[in-house]
């Protein structure tokens, strides 16, 4: 099993005079949706596709709800989801307001077993 990559040319953001360099950029081999995940999980167990799909849907909703409460969602050896923000700065601590949060991003940190799978990926040029 391998992951393919293309070569892309990029400059340094904010520094147009810096020479551009070439970098590998992963090429997706396809997409897997919730139904595909549910079907695959059902094939690996004694649970029906419909029941598995319902569990997957609930699971995804719970992750979003817990993140919206400000919680880190730890899923054992799979990893953790947490929120990060993009913000605008203020000159003084007293003048910091919620309106300075310009974007909320979801981050994922893989757990040990997940990372071990990632470490086995073989890359090849597309």
PLM ranges: what are they?
Residues 1-126:
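Strongly charged
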């Amino acid at each position: 099993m391998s992951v393919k990559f293309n070569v892309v040319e990029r400059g340094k953001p904010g520094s147009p005079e810096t020479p551009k360099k070439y970098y590998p950029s992963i090429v997706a081999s396809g997409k897997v949706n919730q139904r595909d995940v549910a079907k695959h999980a059902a094939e690996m167990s004694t649970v029906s596709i419909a029941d598995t799909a319902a569990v997957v849907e609930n699971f995804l909703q719970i992750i979003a709800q817990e993140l919206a409460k400000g919680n880190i969602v730890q899923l054992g050896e799979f990893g953790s989801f947490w929120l990060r923000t993009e913000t605008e700065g203020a000159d003084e601590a007293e003048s910091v307001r919620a309106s300075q949060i310009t974007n909320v991003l979801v981050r994922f940190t893989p757990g040990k077993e997940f990372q071990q799978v990632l470490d086995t990926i073989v890359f090849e040029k597309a």
